[in-house]
Design a protein with these regions (language model features):
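Conserved beta-propeller blade repeats
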Residues: 29-46, 74-92, 103, 115-116, ...
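Beta-propeller blade-edge and WD-like acidic-aromatic loop motif
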Residues: 2-20, 50-69, 94-116, 142-160, ...
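Short glycine/serine/proline-enriched coil/turn segments at secondary-structure junctions
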Residues: 97-98, 187-190, 217, 356-357, ...
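Active-site-proximal cap/loop segments of hydrolase catalytic domains
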Residues: 425-619
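Flexible loop/turn segments at secondary-structure boundaries
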Residues: 54-55, 189, 244-246, 268-270, ...
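Structured loop/turn residues at beta-strand edges in well-structured enzyme cores
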Residues: 65, 84, 98, 175, ...
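Cap/lid segment of the alpha/beta-hydrolase catalytic domain
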Residues: 350-467, 472-474, 509-517
Length: 619
């Protein structure tokens, strides 16, 4: 049994009972995801909520206006789907958050014999896509042996359409269920996938699309989004990056022609069809904010859809043309809203119980960096001026970005008297392909260079106290935290790393196969092929240089950042006489249990307070 120093989890963070209740209430307040509905029975919907204290699946009968909790598992359940007729709810059955399992289904109407395997014959694996038709189920899974994509037509039995050692996934099933678009990386670049469209009856190929790399050698990906939702319509909506950012095209399989959509918006785009396939609902992301638009496919007219400034987390168009979407901003807690065809924008679902307390506005900084300005979002505690202790909260991914959205975690750090800085470093999405791909071949050090220039800005602008700067993050952000503590020890007074990559060679050996494929694409090969790149980018390589106290939080069942490589790093800290603590929990890559998230947050703030000495004033 290991003897690592355990992290202290205090009973309270604040002496003021109102402040204590406020921060906890931001986490325990019920939240609801944007609902999905059955295609042919749109009154039947499912959504996820933490109302029970754990994120679980709920059924919503809109006609009867009734809600029912479907799943009840100790470590929660991630998302669900509905059969086309709305009779069955599908959810992914893994073990304690390990993401390895099978799809199961149960009646929408209520519990009967309990959930049963939804697709007899499907192997246990990591999910690689699901698309449900009237008579056809398209399902994918991955294992250490690679990816398998299969169909079951009319209950005739599972039949493999595609199998490969490289990463692949279900893209989209055509409305007439004769074509299946798949995303694949046979070319060895999982970060920039290609598309193949297969005939469902026999698995033969209708067409392939693989964008060749740009002149600078960097890849260009293609992503199948959706077929037009009209029977006989073989138009496939595709995401591309041919002009250096995420844009859209229509690939008509009937004529094998492409039409790139020229949409006059400066940021990255994603979209889906309106129900009659006449238009697209377009999501536009730029500088950490989201706007929504309607793009008419016949005329090319783009119409802005009115939404408040902030971030949209999921959206879809109902049969009547209403747009349902999730929205929040740094100040305003998340809410599921609906934009009616007549222009009314109102709350669709109000979670039960008290609403979480608001927080403060995020401001923007654009800081000159090595390859362009680095975008940072920041906030300081209300009522403060001059330098204050500052948490550099680093996002995961790396293909993700911090946005102007509500965060209970950010809010409690601000309440505790810390400024918060988010850095959308090179590697982040939302700033164009070149920015996202700048870390290829040099991961870790590239992102840290951007974090360093933002750190310098925060200190020089009298936001951050240079003696009280905290490096904090989860997943890839946790990885960058550990790497930063070793490569930039002069910058950081303390570090908190949640579910991090800590020993890259051991992580590669133990992680799920889709992430190995991602790493090969990111690093330029496997550890056998480019060992020095992995060695240089691995936090354990630089552990001797760590000066700051380190808190690590890790899941025992994490398939993405497995526990063995975390233990290797802790052993290296211990051998070097470094100050550290560990919080272990019985789940995977993060927790769906609200009480566990509260423990993590309390442990981080308590650890940082002890490391920095006298606490800043509470707000």
């Amino acid at each position: 049994m290991r003897q690592d120093p355990p992290a202290e989890v205090p009973d309270t963070l604040f002496a003021d009972p109102a402040a204590e209740a406020r921060w906890r209430g931001r986490f325990t307040a019920a939240r609801i995801s944007v609902p999905n509905w059955a295609r042919d029975a749109p009154s039947h919907s499912v959504y996820s909520s933490n109302a029970s204290g754990t994120w679980e699946v709920y059924a919503w009968d809109r006609d009867a206006d009734t809600h029912r909790q479907v799943t009840d598992r100790p470590q929660g359940t991630r998302g669900a789907a509905l059969s086309v007729d709305g009779a069955a709810i599908w959810w992914f059955d893994d073990t304690d958050g390990d993401e390895f399992g099978v799809w199961v289904s149960e009646p929408f109407a209520g519990p009967g014999a309990g959930p049963a395997p939804a697709v007899p014959g499907a192997d246990r694996g990591y999910p690689a896509g699901l698309d449900l038709g009237t008579t056809t189920t398209a399902i994918g899974w991955s294992t250490d042996d690679g990816s398998t994509l299969a169909v079951d037509v009319g209950g005739s039995g599972l039949r493999t359409l595609y199998q490969h050692t490289e990463d692949a996934g279900i893209g989209a099933l055509s409305r007439d269920e004769t074509l299946l678009a798949v995303s694949h990386s046979e070319h060895g670049d999982a970060r920039h996938p290609a598309i193949r469209v297969l005939r469902v009856p026999d698995g033969s190929s209708v067409g392939d699309r693989h964008d060749t790399p740009r002149a600078d050698g960097q890849g260009r990906g293609l992503t199948p989004i959706a077929f037009a939702p009209v029977a006989g319509d073989q138009r496939l909506l595709v995401g591309h990056e041919r002009r250096g950012r995420d844009e859209l095209l229509i690939w008509d399989l009937a004529s094998d022609t492409e039409t790139e959509l020229v949409i006059d918006l400066p940021g990255d785009l994603t979209a889906d069809f309106y129900p009659d396939a006449s238009a697209l609902l377009v999501g536009h992301t730029r500088a950490g904010r989201t706007t929504m638009h309607r793009y008419d496919l016949a005329s090319g007219v783009l119409t802005d859809l009115p939404t408040a400034p902030g971030s949209v987390g999921g959206s879809d168009v109902r049969p009547d043309g209403s747009v349902e979407y999730g929205w929040s901003s740094a100040t305003s807690p998340p809410l599921v809203r609906v934009l009616r065809p007549d222009g009314r924008d109102e709350a669709l679902l109000t979670p039960p119980g008290d609403r979480p307390a608001p927080s403060v506005v995020l401001d923007d900084a654009w800081v000159p960096g090595e390859e362009g300005d680095v975008h940072a979002l920041w906030a300081r505690p209300e009522g403060t001026s001059g330098p204050v202790p500052t948490v550099f909260m680093i996002h995961g991914g790396p293909q993700a970005a911090d946005e102007d959205r509500y965060s209970a975690v950010r809010a409690v750090w601000l309440d505790a008297g810390f400024a918060v800085v988010h850095v959308n470093y090179r590697g982040s999405s939302g700033y164009g392909s070149a920015w996202r791909d700048a870390i290829e071949g040099r991961p870790g050090t590239t992102e840290l260079a951007d974090i360093a220039v933002v750190h310098e800005w925060a200190v020089s602008s009298d936001l951050a106290d240079p003696a009280a700067c905290v490096l904090e993050g989860w997943s890839w952000g946790g990885y960058l935290t550990l790497l930063g503590l070793g490569l930039q020890p002069e910058l950081w007074a303390v570090g908190c790393a949640g579910v991090p990559v800590a020993d890259y060679l051991a992580a590669y050996a133990d992680e799920m196969e889709p992430l190995r494929a991602f790493d090969r694409s990111l690093f330029g090969g496997s550890p056998t092929e480019v060992p020095e790149v992995y060695r240089r980018a691995s936090p354990i390589t630089h552990v001797a240089a760590v000066r700051a106290p380190v808190l690590v939080l890790a899941g025992e069942n994490d398939p993405r950042c497995p526990i063995r490589q975390v233990d290797n790093y802790l052993d290296a800290l211990a051998a070097g006489g470094k100050e550290y603590a560990i919080l272990r929990y019985d789940a995977g890559h993060g927790s769906l249990v609200v009480a566990e998230t509260l423990r993590h947050t309390a442990a981080e703030i308590a650890f940082v307070r002890r490391a920095l000495g006298p606490a800043p004033p509470e707000r």
